[in-house]
């Protein structure tokens, strides 16, 4: 009975800030952590287990110590996950395995696109032109601009 009383006495925090991201405190830990860019469900579960937190617990009801443990595990991501789980293996510039999260995801994506454009690779040229990059057909789909109507022969002859 005492555990239920202590659980109900813990106040729910609706927003929990981890890794410069506001996370929903009403969700389970493993689902709430997916709100951080670069963290999927599998990695979120790994973070929770490494921090000693129940992945199915509600994030907003966790005590401050467990949230700090989660923050520490996320900050030291290179030490806590194997290289095959990282989203940026053998980085183009540095050659180091790393995991990119948060605002870094957009920055590195933009840098990669700029490198492709500067080297004039096929993908870079397609990105510059705003066309499909991954081999999709473009004959009839992916058109942009105003639609051009077809004029009938009778009206065309009068003009």
Swiss-Prot record:
GO terms for molecular function: rRNA binding; structural constituent of ribosome. InterPro entries: Rbsml_uS13_C, Ribosomal_uS13, Ribosomal_uS13-like_H2TH, Ribosomal_uS13_archaeal, Ribosomal_uS13_CS. Residues 138-149 have a biased composition (Low complexity). Residues 136-159 are annotated as: Disordered. GO terms for cellular component: cytosol; small ribosomal subunit. It holds the Pfam family Ribosomal_S13. Keywords: Ribonucleoprotein, Ribosomal protein, RNA-binding, rRNA-binding. One of its GO terms (biological process) is translation. Located at the top of the head of the 30S subunit, it contacts several helices of the 16S rRNA. In the 70S ribosome it contacts the 23S rRNA (bridge B1a) and protein L5 of the 50S subunit (bridge B1b), connecting the 2 subunits; these bridges are implicated in subunit movement. Belongs to the universal ribosomal protein uS13 family. HAMAP family: Ribosomal_uS13. Part of the 30S ribosomal subunit. Forms a loose heterodimer with protein S19. Forms two bridges to the 50S subunit in the 70S ribosome. This is Small ribosomal subunit protein uS13. It comes from Methanothrix thermoacetophila (strain DSM 6194 / JCM 14653 / NBRC 101360 / PT) (Methanosaeta thermophila). The lineage of its organism: Archaea, Methanobacteriati, Methanobacteriota, Stenosarchaea group, Methanomicrobia.
């Amino acid at each position: 009975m005492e555990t239920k009383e202590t659980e109900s006495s813990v106040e729910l925090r609706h927003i929990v800030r981890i890794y410069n991201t506001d996370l929903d405190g009403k969700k389970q830990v493993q689902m709430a952590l997916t709100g951080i860019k670069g963290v999927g469900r599998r990695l979120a579960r790994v973070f929770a287990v490494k921090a000693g937190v129940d992945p199915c617990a509600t994030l907003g009801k966790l005590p401050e110590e467990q949230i700090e443990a989660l923050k520490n595990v996320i900050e030291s991501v290179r030490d806590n996950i194997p290289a095959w789980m990282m989203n940026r293996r053998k980085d183009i510039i540095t050659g180091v395995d790393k995991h990119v999260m948060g605002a870094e995801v957009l920055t590195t994506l933009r840098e990669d696109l700029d490198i492709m454009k500067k080297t004039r690779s096929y993908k870079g040229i397609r990105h510059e032109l705003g066309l499909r990059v991954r081999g999709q057909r473009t004959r009839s789909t992916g058109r942009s601009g105003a639609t051009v109507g077809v004029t009938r022969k009778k009206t065309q002859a009068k003009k």
